[in-house]
């Protein structure tokens, strides 16, 4: 099992602090395994088994605890007085009124709470209001390229590893089935169907599953493109599948809530304001795109852009698409008063491509760092302060 050091460090940072640790992310990205590793770490450091309580609410053995009153009574009964109690709750959003249990336990002394969820419902609306100031969200993703390399048993060069990474995807279990192409496909297809049926269709009570699947295919085929709800609706209608903009908006919202897609808003770099129209959507894992739409040899540029987005999301900060006049910067990352700007391109060895990619970055007048990430395996180059970096090195080594 790969120790996910960055995430383990975050859990350790917040250990014993009076906040609820909420680990969110797409199904099977490793949330349960992360908490299991952290639990083992606690035991190795001398915490008694009696001080640790863990419950997975997808386990049929725990079905009785889906009643929040039964759950609360059970937890209260198992608390050890005078010592810190570590509570690990997997997929707690399955418990009706779970927020009442969490809120009541939070009021107790010597209780450290860790929960996971595969749906944004866990932190939505009234629940988020109830827990405001009481929780910290730790966003978990499938393996980064660096983690993927660490977990590999094969000794392969970066480019070959990257090709496999975008073909098979980055879910931890993929590495256990040793890249068997048919097994990978079956696993990802099963995972995708579970997400769509359990986290989207059931929760949102969607009746036209075929239409939902059509919208998912459209979105997966258009990662990294500006998505306008009306354009999606018009495209579906032109294909003979009439659908309203309101329905499309509901579908997209549900898919984002299930963490299968991530939404990135646009930011006007000159006006310093968030734009209300247009967004880009990125998949939580490129392997899923291959089972949704079939493996395609093209569109490697948007696939690379998707990979870079996920890496930036792992590293933290608010991520936006930058608007500079009529031009666009792929990503603007805001960390407090500090910004980072990123352009992503498969290759800039063509002079015109180089000029086109550099122009939006050169139009930014501040002194914050600017990067041009490409698949060109060349030494790092500076273009008037803009760092051109081989993207696979950046993925492995950071900036």
Predicted regions and their residues:
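Pre-Walker A adenine-sensing motif
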Residues: 2-16
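Interdomain motor-coupling "hinge/lid" segment immediately C-terminal to the ATP-binding subdomain
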Residues: 118-120, 124-226
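Domain-level recognition of nuclease-like catalytic cores that cleave nucleotide substrates
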Residues: 377-399
């Amino acid at each position: 099992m790969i120790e996910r050091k960055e995430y383990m460090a975050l859990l350790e940072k917040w250990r014993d602090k009076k906040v609820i640790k909420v680990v969110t992310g797409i199904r099977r990205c490793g949330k349960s395994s992360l908490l299991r590793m952290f639990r083992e770490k606690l035991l190795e450091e001398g915490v008694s088994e009696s001080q640790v309580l863990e419950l997975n609410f997808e386990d049929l053995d725990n079905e009785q605890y889906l009643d929040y009153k039964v759950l609360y009574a059970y937890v209260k009964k198992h608390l050890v007085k005078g010592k810190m109690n570590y509570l690990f709750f997997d997929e707690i959003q399955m418990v009706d009124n779970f927020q009442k249990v969490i809120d009541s336990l939070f009021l107790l002394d010597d209780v450290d709470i860790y929960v996971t969820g595969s749906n944004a419902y866990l932190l939505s609306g009234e629940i988020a209001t109830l827990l405001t100031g009481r929780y910290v969200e730790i966003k978990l993703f499938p393996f980064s390229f660096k983690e993927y390399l660490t977990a590999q048993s094969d000794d392969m060069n970066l480019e070959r590893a990257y090709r496999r990474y975008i073909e098979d995807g980055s879910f931890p279990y993929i590495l256990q089935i040793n890249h068997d192409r048919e097994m990978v496909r079956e696993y990802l297809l099963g995972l995708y169907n579970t997400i769509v049926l359990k986290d989207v269709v059931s929760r949102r009570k969607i009746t036209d599953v075929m239409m939902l699947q059509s919208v998912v295919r459209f979105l997966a085929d258009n990662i990294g493109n500006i998505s306008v709800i009306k354009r999606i609706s018009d495209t579906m209608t032109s294909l003979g599948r009439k659908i309203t903009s309101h329905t499309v908006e509901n579908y997209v919202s549900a898919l984002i809530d299930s963490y299968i897609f991530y939404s990135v808003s646009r930011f006007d770099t000159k006006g310093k304001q968030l734009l209300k129209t247009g967004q880009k959507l990125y998949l939580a894992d490129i392997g899923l795109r291959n089972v949704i739409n079939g493996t395609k040899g093209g569109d490697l540029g948007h696939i690379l852009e998707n990979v870079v987005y996920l890496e930036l999301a792992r590293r933290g900060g608010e991520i936006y698409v930058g608007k500079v006049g009529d031009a666009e910067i792929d990503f603007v990352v805001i960390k407090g008063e500090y910004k980072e700007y990123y352009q992503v391109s498969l290759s800039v060895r063509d002079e015109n491509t180089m000029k086109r990619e550099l122009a939006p970055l050169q139009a930014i007048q501040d002194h914050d760092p600017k990067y041009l990430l490409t698949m060109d395996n060349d030494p790092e180059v500076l273009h008037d302060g803009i760092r051109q970096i081989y993207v696979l090195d950046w993925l492995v080594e950071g900036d």
